[in-house]
Structures are given as C-alpha cells and as structure tokens.
Amino acid sequence: GLWETIKNFGKKFTLNILHNLKCKIGGGC
C-alpha cells in the first residue's frame, strides 16, 4: 500500500543522508 511505499522511501532517504554525512565527516567514500 501507500504507507509501505512512504516508509520504504523514508528509509532509503535516511540511509542516503547518513551515508553522505559519513562521507563528509570521514573525508570521502
């Protein structure tokens, strides 16, 4: 359903932000 789609999108979005933060703090990927 729609809620599952929203949850999945939110999870991917959050993981993406965490990954970007790690890259900036860690100095590259």
Swiss-Prot record:
Taxonomic superkingdom: Eukaryota
Subcellular location(s) of the protein: Secreted
GO cellular component: extracellular region
Tissue-wise expression: Expressed by the skin glands.
GO term, biological process aspect, one: defense response to bacterium
Keyword Nuclease: no
Keywords: Amphibian defense peptide, Antibiotic, Antimicrobial, Disulfide bond, Secreted
Disulphides: C23-C29
Cited function: Antibacterial activity against representative Gram-negative and Gram-positive bacteria.
Family, as annotated: Belongs to the frog skin active peptide (FSAP) family. Brevinin subfamily.
Protein name: Brevinin-2Td
Protein source organism: Rana temporaria
High-level lineage: Eukaryota, Metazoa, Chordata, Craniata, Vertebrata
